[in-house]
Swiss-Prot record:
GO terms for cellular component: endoplasmic reticulum membrane; membrane. GO terms for biological process: embryo development ending in seed dormancy; flower development; leaf vascular tissue pattern formation; meristem development; photomorphogenesis; proteolysis; regulation of floral meristem growth; regulation of inflorescence meristem growth. One of its GO terms (molecular function) is metal ion binding. This is Probable glutamate carboxypeptidase AMP1. Keywords: Carboxypeptidase, Endoplasmic reticulum, Glycoprotein, Hydrolase, Membrane, Metal-binding, Metalloprotease, Protease, Signal-anchor, Transmembrane, Transmembrane helix, Zinc.
């Protein structure tokens, strides 16, 4: 039963009376009382003993970090996750409101300033799904499309925003469903026109792109399976096939309650949805279909990857598939929870930590491993506040809704606040699946690389005694990825608003992704039995927030960014083989490099100045430099956006409109190359990126021409 969004009653403090040379029994009782008091304090920061006098100096900064790290509690995080995963909580459903209340009440119980930002969005749910196979001997087979018992509260596997309808035809196996896979089929005389295609999900294409390409090739319907088999349980991977992100009936503006909504037949809306039905399948069912296929043998490269056998045929075969999806699209209320921890000196500058709350099923990994870490960070921040700390800059803790449908909650919030974000957001720190296995992974915009590595040096590795996360990261992975992908809530912040961003997670992948088996039970038996990885992630995430909020000078390194731009330019030049000049890029990057070094020198000088509030001149210089450091990323935005995906404005990191792009950066240039555009068009895209880099240089340098 849902609880009202009210503040929980606070509890009075506990005092411990000191004593000398107690007898053994008293000593034992004292230890017990101390343990209980410590446990109580961690869970009820209102009861912390009188606050420390907090002043901003190196010693107190160190004490603050130590207090934050030492107040970690794996048992507490475990209890949060257990509560969050008691029931499925798909966005727009009643159980999702229970999860909303739990998160909201948790924040309020800590005494944190908390509010709900409500929106209205078009969501998609299944009403009927079926897949049957007919054979030439009149045998019929109906596939089981559920990965849980019939009376389970978990939503049946489906693709959100698939159109309702049926498709009947022979089956053709299309590998990962990429353009090159269809080219391979064409080379052996196989067409998918009038057929149902079977695709295995790969790394390069999302579900929506797989369906879009199949539709363009003349397929009637699409079945998609994942080779991980749901951890051996027969799990089926749910997901969305909507194109783009955000509420489809309020494209480009916030979906506020009572605001403008387009009709479902508006062209701006219909182009977001596929025109042919699609459904997810289990690996078990996919293998039945694969075994029935005749026709030509699959290309060698298909048979050398994944679980495709050496004798695999691509079809068509003697099996005819009849697939049906019936669904309904409904306007639903979605709710973001936002905590505000006001800054003491630069309250108008914001460091944002975010995680989504909604899940396809129970969501133990995706996303509530991240949610439980965020709840623990809030508990520890409340403890710091009781000790006398206040951040220099304002910190926001955000719990997003409806991410699984296409990052809807965060996108609507960004669209409503885009001007304020552009003027005052320092950074966005995203954690979606905090823990899905072993090993630390991260993606970031390059100016945050150095800060991230510094923080990793402060956190103990959960899997290697005596080592820091930085030491194991350096030996096992040591790659900070770039954020051109669109698969979590950082996308709108970086690609649309130009906010420096980080995305982090433990574990490269996990087998129960988006299945009914993503549960608390799976977490404690597989990914993190003792919740030590959760503790490490919460430590990294929270310390990043503290340092970005507290450091007098924002810890951004644009020399690192310049080096990365140069590496991107070199790779592009090699790809173009001299056919198109990259000189505009070279000149722009050279200028950016010089300005980055000047800014680094300026920061070095200012670090030697007094941090006293009374030193007005030094404070003004720091503020002016901080503003320039903060605004650089906005320079990479272009009002026209990426051709074909105009909502995405970032010209250095953003999603390429063409899935076959050979670059993970410069999306406009990458698309032009992938589409075999003329040299003039490619050159124009190069100039667009060069101008964006020049804008970033101007922002970092300050002043006017």
């Amino acid at each position: 039963m849902s609880q009202p969004l009210t503040t929980r009653p606070t509890v009075t403090g506990i005092s411990i009376i000191p004593f000398r040379q107690p007898p053994p029994l008293c000593s034992f009782l004292f230890v017990i009382v101390l343990f209980v008091a410590t446990f109580y304090t961690l869970h009820h920061p209102d009861a912390v003993t009188p606050p420390l006098l907090f002043s901003r100096n190196a010693y107190n900064a160190l004490r603050l970090r130590r207090l934050f790290l030492s107040s970690a509690s794996n048992a507490t995080i475990s209890s949060y996750l257990r509560e969050l995963t008691r029931h499925p909580h798909l966005a727009g459903t009643k159980p999702s409101l229970d999860t909303l209340h739990y998160v909201f009440n948790h924040f309020q119980s800590l005494g944190l300033e908390t509010h709900v930002a409500e929106y209205e969005a078009l969501l998609s749910y299944p009403t009927h799904i079926s897949v049957t196979a007919s054979f030439s001997n009149t045998t019929t087979l109906e596939f089981d499309l559920n990965d849980v018992p019939g009376d389970s509260p978990v939503v049946r596997p489906y693709h959100a925003y698939s159109p309702s309808g049926s498709a009947q035809g022979n089956v053709v196996f299309v590998n990962h469903g990429e353009e090159r896979d269809y080219h391979a089929l064409e080379s052996i005389g196989v067409s998918v026109k009038g057929c149902v295609v079977l695709a295995r999900k790969g790394e390069n294409l999302g579900r929506g792109a797989i369906v879009k390409i199949a539709e363009a090739k003349g397929a009637l319907g699409v079945l998609i399976y994942a080779e991980n088999d749901g951890g051996g349980f027969g799990g089926i991977e749910r997901g969305t096939v909507m194109r783009g992100i955000g509420d489809p009936v309020s494209p480009g503006w916030p979906g506020v309650v009572g605001g403008e909504k387009l009709s479902l037949d508006d062209e701006l809306v219909t182009r977001r949805f596929p025109k042919i039905p699609s459904l997810p399948l289990s690996l078990r069912n996919a293998e039945i279909i694969l075994a029935s296929l005749g026709g030509a043998r699959a290309p060698l490269e298909w048979r050398n990857s994944g679980r495709v056998g050496p004798g695999q045929r691509v079809g068509p075969g003697r099996m005819v598939i009849n697939m049906t999806f019936q669904g309904e699209m409904k306007m639903k209320k979605i709710n973001n929870v936002v905590v505000t921890i006001r800054g003491s000196e630069e309250a108008d500058r914001y460091v944002i930590l975010g995680n989504h709350r909604d899940a396809w099923t129970y969501g133990a990994v995706d996303p509530n491993s991240g949610t439980s870490a965020l709840l623990d960070i809030s508990r520890r921040f409340a403890l710091l506040l009781k000790s006398g700390w206040r951040p220099r800059r304002t910190i926001l803790l955000c719990s997003w809704d409806a991410e699984e449908f296409g990052m809807i909650g965060s996108t609507e919030w960004i669209e409503e606040n885009v001007l304020n974000l552009g003027a005052s957001a320092v950074a966005y720190l995203n954690v979606d699946c905090a823990v899905q296995g072993s090993g630390f992974f991260a993606g970031a915009t390059p100016q945050l690389d150095g800060l991230l590595v510094d923080v990793l040096k402060l956190v103990q590795d959960p899997d290697a005694v005596g080592l820091t996360v930085e030491e194991t990261f350096k030996s096992q992975n040591n790659i900070i990825q770039r954020l051109s992908r669109v698969d979590s809530d950082f996308s709108g912040f970086l690609h649309h608003a130009g906010i420096p961003s980080i995305d982090m997670y433990y574990g490269a992948d996990y087998p129960v992704y988006h299945t009914a088996f993503d549960s608390y039970d799976w977490m404690i038996h597989n990914a993190d039995p003792l919740f030590h990885r959760h503790v490490a992630m919460a430590g990294i995430w929270g310390l990043l927030g503290i340092l970005l909020a507290d450091e007098p000078l924002i810890p951004f390194d644009y020399i690192s960014y310049a080096d990365q731009l140069q590496a991107h330019r070199d790779k592009l030049s090699k790809l173009l083989e001299g056919k198109v000049s990259v000189n505009p890029l070279s000149m722009a990057i050279q200028e950016f490099s010089l300005v980055a070094k000047e800014a680094a020198d300026e920061a070095k000088k200012l670090k030697g100045k007094s941090y006293s509030k009374n030193d007005v001149a030094a404070a003004a210089k720091r503020r002016e430099l901080n503003d320039r450091l903060m605004l650089v990323e906005r320079g990479f935005l272009d009002a026209e956006g990426i051709k074909g995906k105009e909502w995405f404005k970032h010209l250095v990191y953003g999603p390429a409109a063409e899935p076959e792009s050979k670059l993970g950066f410069f999306p406009g240039i990458a698309d032009a190359i992938a589409m075999n555009a003329s040299e003039g068009i490619i050159e124009h895209e190069i100039w667009r990126v060069a101008r964006a880099i020049q804008r970033a240089s101007k922002a970092l340098k300050g002043g006017f021409t």
